[in-house]
């Protein structure tokens, strides 16, 4: 009876066989083998997390970065189902009262819309909004540099589909006045969370105007009064901010200036995105600033663009605001928590905490830190 070869023995045998063939065949076969090896390795380390629930929570929230459901991601969802890409994080979302992310593409009902004058155009179908609703997302940000990739009609389709799914969208509207009205308010156990969205990067003609759909720019004349207004009606103000330089792991001066202005206006939590890579966390005057959570659902293949983070926020009965940041790896557009004590986990946490100005620790594979949020319970 022939002995069954192990995977590594098969790999060695294949490598030896390739030496007898041309260099062309070697260069084709070996990368395929390593792709397969990586797939096996990733499948082995991806684990569906066991979600802890806390009896002393008043509310729990989850924040993620860029969600792009088109291009190659759409091919994955067509083959495996749209819900499959959330299989490793769905339990976290299910356990959250509030879930937010950046919707990095317009919904288009047709394929023949006029494209914006730019190089890269992203779009997705209406099923993407439904699956986000099914995954327990409560609000998405549309203030970004791809929201108007398919013009006014693409924006109208997007706003219309979110309304059909009864899913809040911020950062864009049918006009400037409509976009300014789109402050999402959600009440959980007597605590009101407000969400707003702004973008500091966009294409020509993307900004909402008096009679034209579009996005809200990160203009202090717009965001300061809006954040101040939200602060009057909410206990916690969350600002989604699309900003920074793509593929830069360090926030620039412009991001820091905007973050401070948003904080001074009343923002409690600022969630940044657009760089497609992770940037550090900062605490400024009690405001927690995630300069960039990177991608969350995306088809970019570079290592740094696959490093991500999922933030869980727990407001405790004693007024503690507890932040738990789970390191995430993206493979085949699918985000999954990385293994505890792995090199990937340490790399992601190091990126998030470099030059940190707050006390943090690692617990159960997560980066954790506490902020005094006792003032958020005053309305209860």
From Swiss-Prot:
By its UniProt entry, which InterPro entries does this protein fall under? Capsule_synth_CapA, CW_Biosynth-Accessory, Metallo-depent_PP-like
Effect of loss of the gene: Cells produce PGA but at a greatly reduced level.
Query: Entry's SMART domains?
Result: PGA_cap
Q: Which family does it belong to?
A: Belongs to the CapA family.
Function, as annotated, reads: Seems to be required for maximum PGA (gamma-polyglutamic acid) production.
Protein name as it appears in the record: PGA biosynthesis protein CapA
The taxonomic lineage of its organism, from the top, reads: Bacteria, Bacillati, Bacillota, Bacilli, Bacillales
**GN (gene name):** capA
